[in-house]
From Swiss-Prot:
Entry EC number(s): 1.4.4.2
Keywords in alphabetical order: Oxidoreductase
Function recorded in the entry: The glycine cleavage system catalyzes the degradation of glycine. The P protein binds the alpha-amino group of glycine through its pyridoxal phosphate cofactor; CO(2) is released and the remaining methylamine moiety is then transferred to the lipoamide cofactor of the H protein.
Gene3D superfamilies xref list: Aspartate Aminotransferase, domain 1, Type I PLP-dependent aspartate aminotransferase-like (Major domain)
Protein name (Swiss-Prot/TrEMBL): Probable glycine dehydrogenase (decarboxylating) subunit 1
GO molecular function terms listed in the Swiss-Prot or TrEMBL record: glycine dehydrogenase (decarboxylating) activity
Pfam families to which the protein is assigned, alphabetical: GDC-P (PF02347)
GO terms, biological process: glycine decarboxylation via glycine cleavage system; nucleoside metabolic process
Coiled-coil residue spans: none
Length: 443
């Protein structure tokens, strides 16, 4: 929109309406010593073409997966996004800043969310999914709070290696609510020790949390962890990578009470870290305890199918002391992207994408461990991420690989850990992986 300056008559009219004789009269309450008494040192005005050129020059200094080969992971993945997704979600019926406070008026939006919920339930093998949460980390924290609400217990135990940032968000949520700190069992060969977990989980534990695959990319023994939780009367919470469910068993199949996840890989761009999508699913018996929005299907007075927001347990809708959550929105557009993604790929497509990631990750790992000085840090099975022991500090590799147009992975020393976390998605080609391995051999 072009900038149209206020005219003298415009300013006079506004001052008169404000009951001020002059601009100085209008700001009389601002102390003289803090008023700006000189012009701002601004660059000269530019025309539109010059502004565009300058902004494009600044943007070109960014490094993104559009111009680099990415082996970054740790919760945000360089997945292929079919062009049909952008075409569908960019339609004006969906792509809007409007929040449907009279939700039932927006039947199309509600149906889209309903379809998302249905698809997520099928993917995770669970009974009920909500309309979405902010991201995977907040979904996990809300799951822990829900478990405490359901069981009346205070303790949360983490089995295996949770993403450090998710762990931090979890601790922030629980600490702010006055709950006990989270405790974690020991990690051996990349996965949680079942023996140490068994000694930590008792009748005082509200929930046992596991990330599958875990932060290191390794596969936890979810069957054993779930059994320990059930024996102690604790809820079993699984934070699952949605893409892994193309080849791994769904959380519902091995007894998860609550299953959450980060939905970014389902059609959302990495986009500087957000907005992302929090997946939240539960068993049917917990439906009245689920946080956030829930879309249901009903009949109108003429017998036609319709969609509504149902079981609204947010504090905006019911008494605060009765509310299950104070989440004030959801990620509807990202949820729509996930629904379109899942619909386009279908069961077979999800299996193919997950299978390609699995095969390529193991191909690359096998290539790298042949290079002197490199080895896998853990012997546990992995899906599409693995941790490397390296002959030089991972930070050196990461920095030098940038010069070659490659994001080499995550230097785990930023988390106080050791090794280089490498992720492989279906986008990586054999040529890219072979070149990466060749460059690693130069260190």
């Amino acid at each position: 929109m072009p900038f149209i300056i206020n005219t003298d008559s415009d300013r006079a009219e506004m001052l008169a309406a404000a009951g001020a004789a002059s601009f100085n009269d209008l700001i009389a309450d601002i102390p003289e010593e803090i008023r700006l008494k000189k012009s701002l040192d601004l660059a000269p005005a530019l025309d539109e073409m010059a502004v565009r050129r300058q902004l494009e020059s600044l943007a070109a200094r960014n490094r993104s997966t559009a111009g680099y080969v990415s082996f970054l992971g740790g919760g945000a993945y360089d997945q292929f996004i079919p062009s049909a997704i952008r075409a569908i979600v960019s339609r004006s019926e969906f792509y809007t800043a409007y929040t449907p406070y009279q939700a039932e008026v927006s039947q199309g939006t509600l149906q889209a969310i309903y379809e998302y919920q249905s698809l997520i339930c099928r993917l995770y093998g669970m009974d009920v999914a909500n309309a979405s949460m902010y991201d995977g980390a907040t979904a996990l924290a809300e799951a822990a709070l829900m478990a405490m609400n359901v069981t009346g217990k205070e303790r949360i135990v983490v089995a295996g290696q949770l993403h450090p940032w998710n762990s931090s968000v979890l601790s922030t949520y629980l600490g702010a609510a006055g709950h006990s700190p989270v405790v974690q069992n020991s990690v051996e060969e990349g996965v949680g020790s079942i023996a140490s977990l068994r000694g930590m989980v008792d009748g005082t534990v509200a929930a046992v949390i596991v990330q599958q695959p875990n932060f290191y990319g390794c596969l936890e023994d979810v069957e054993a962890i779930g059994a320990i939780a059930r024996e102690a009367g604790a809820l079993f919470i699984v934070s699952a990578d949605p893409h892994s469910l193309g080849v791994l068993e769904a959380p519902g199949a091995y007894g998860a009470d609550i299953a959450v996840g980060e939905g970014q890989p389902l059609g959302s761009a990495q986009s500087f870290g957000g907005p992302y999508l929090g997946i939240f699913t539960v068993r049917e018996k917990f439906v009245r305890k689920i946080p956030g929005r829930l879309v249901g299907m009903t009949k109108d007075r003429d017998g036609r199918d319709g969609f509504i927001l149902t079981l609204q347990t947010r504090e905006q809708h019911i008494r605060r002391e009765k509310a299950t959550s104070n989440i004030c929105t959801n990620q509807a557009l990202n949820a729509l992207q996930a629904a379109v993604y899942l619909s386009l790929l279908g069961r077979q497509g999800m299996q193919e994408v997950a299978g390609q990631s699995l095969e390529r990750a193991h191909y690359l790992a096998a290539r790298i461990v042949e290079i002197p000085g490199y080895s896998l840090r853990f012997s546990a099975p992995f899906f599409r991420e693995f941790v490397l022991n390296t002959p030089v500090h991972p930070a050196v590799i990461v920095e030098r690989m940038l010069e070659e147009g490659i994001f080499a992975g995550i230097d785990l020393s930023v988390f106080g850990d050791e090794g280089l976390l490498v992720s492989v998605t279906e986008k990586r080609t054999k040529e890219e992986m072979d070149r990466f391995a060749l460059l690693l051999s130069s260190f």
